[in-house]
């Protein structure tokens, strides 16, 4: 039978949590129970943060595209609809990069979107 609660295993487990709590302040870095709780909480926040990061970046890209599109006389939603009508599939990250680093190229996309929107309005 395998023994899971030996003194050696307990000490190793304890050291693992205390080692991971090295940068914490106060009792958290010295007390096993608190260190363990904060270790698990930190792991959960790290996991959740990785999910939130995706949301935050998408929101940032949309904001940047919207600002640049409005400077060129279109709203964000109109720009995206116009690009879809033109069968141009460029992702938001690249559009945001163009809007910041290469405004003339972004203006070309806006111009194409405007043309497509006008064609749709005529129909």
UniProtKB/Swiss-Prot annotation:
Disulfide bonds: none annotated. Keywords: Ribonucleoprotein, Ribosomal protein, RNA-binding, rRNA-binding. InterPro entries: Ribosomal_bL20 (IPR005813), RIBOSOMAL_L20_CS (IPR049946), Ribosomal_protein_bL20_C (IPR035566). Pfam families: Ribosomal_L20. One of its GO terms (molecular function) is structural constituent of ribosome. GO terms for cellular component: ribonucleoprotein complex; ribosome. GO terms for biological process: ribosomal large subunit assembly; translation. SUPFAM superfamilies: Ribosomal protein L20 (SSF74731). Binds directly to 23S ribosomal RNA and is necessary for the in vitro assembly process of the 50S ribosomal subunit. It is not involved in the protein synthesizing functions of that subunit. Belongs to the bacterial ribosomal protein bL20 family. This is Large ribosomal subunit protein bL20. It comes from Pseudothermotoga lettingae (strain ATCC BAA-301 / DSM 14385 / NBRC 107922 / TMO) (Thermotoga lettingae). The lineage of its organism: Bacteria, Thermotogati, Thermotogota, Thermotogae, Thermotogales.
């Amino acid at each position: 039978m395998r023994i899971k609660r030996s003194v050696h295993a307990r000490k190793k487990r304890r050291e693992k949590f205390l080692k991971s709590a090295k940068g914490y302040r106060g009792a958290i870095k010295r007390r096993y129970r608190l260190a363990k709780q904060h270790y698990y909480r930190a792991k959960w926040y790290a996991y959740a943060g990785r999910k939130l990061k995706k949301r935050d970046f998408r929101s940032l890209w949309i904001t940047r595209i919207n600002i640049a599109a409005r400077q060129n006389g279109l709203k964000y939603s109109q720009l995206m609809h116009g690009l879809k009508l033109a069968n141009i599939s460029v992702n938001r990250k690249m559009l945001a990069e163009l809007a910041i680093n290469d405004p003339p190229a972004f203006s070309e996309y806006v111009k194409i979107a405007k043309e497509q929107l006008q064609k749709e309005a005529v129909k």
